[in-house]
């Protein structure tokens, strides 16, 4: 798994649990931004603007990256909470993240708004 592909903007498409589709997102006004450096990363919520820039929300969380037994995990460190997500699939266009509650989050690489 090339973890560097996680860098950038990702738009949620759907959420599943136990092979049941729970929610689809035809359009989301909030995008997840990931930044990876030296085995650590940050994830924050941003909102795309018409001018192609992003407005950052106050929601930001740091994480550590671990690769064991062929699995890549993100260990999030929040004030009083630690939780782990696993990257099930990652390429230049798609991202699938799972957690211990068996939720599967499907993202696609964000494409900037084009009003031309």
Which residue ranges define each predicted feature?
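N-terminal helix-cap/turn-to-beta initiation motif at the start of protein domains
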Residues: 1-11
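Short, solvent-exposed coil/turn segments at beta-strand boundaries
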Residues: 6, 33-42, 67-71, 88-95, ...
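Short, solvent-exposed loop/turn elements at domain surfaces
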Residues: 17-21
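N-terminal glycine/threonine-rich, aromatic-flanked beta-hairpin/loop signature
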Residues: 23-63, 69
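Well-ordered beta-strand positions in beta-sheet-rich domains
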Residues: 33, 60-64, 82-84, 104-106
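Short beta-strand segments that buttress and anchor functional surface loops
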Residues: 73-78, 95-98
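Short, exposed beta-strand-loop hairpins at the edges of beta-sheets
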Residues: 84-87, 92-106
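C-terminal partner/receptor-binding element of secreted or periplasmic proteins
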Residues: 102-116
């Amino acid at each position: 798994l090339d973890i560097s592909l996680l860098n950038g903007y990702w738009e949620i498409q759907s959420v599943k649990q136990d092979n049941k589709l729970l929610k689809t997102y035809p359009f989301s006004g909030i995008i997840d931004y990931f930044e990876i450096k030296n085995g650590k990363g940050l994830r924050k919520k941003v909102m795309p603007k018409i001018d192609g820039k992003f407005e950052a929300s106050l929601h930001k969380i740091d994480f550590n990256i671990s690769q064991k037994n062929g699995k890549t995990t993100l260990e999030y460190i929040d004030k009083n909470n630690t939780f782990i997500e696993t990257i099930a699939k990652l390429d230049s266009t798609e991202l699938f993240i799972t957690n211990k509650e068996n939720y599967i989050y499907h993202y696609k690489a964000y494409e900037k708004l084009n009003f031309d």
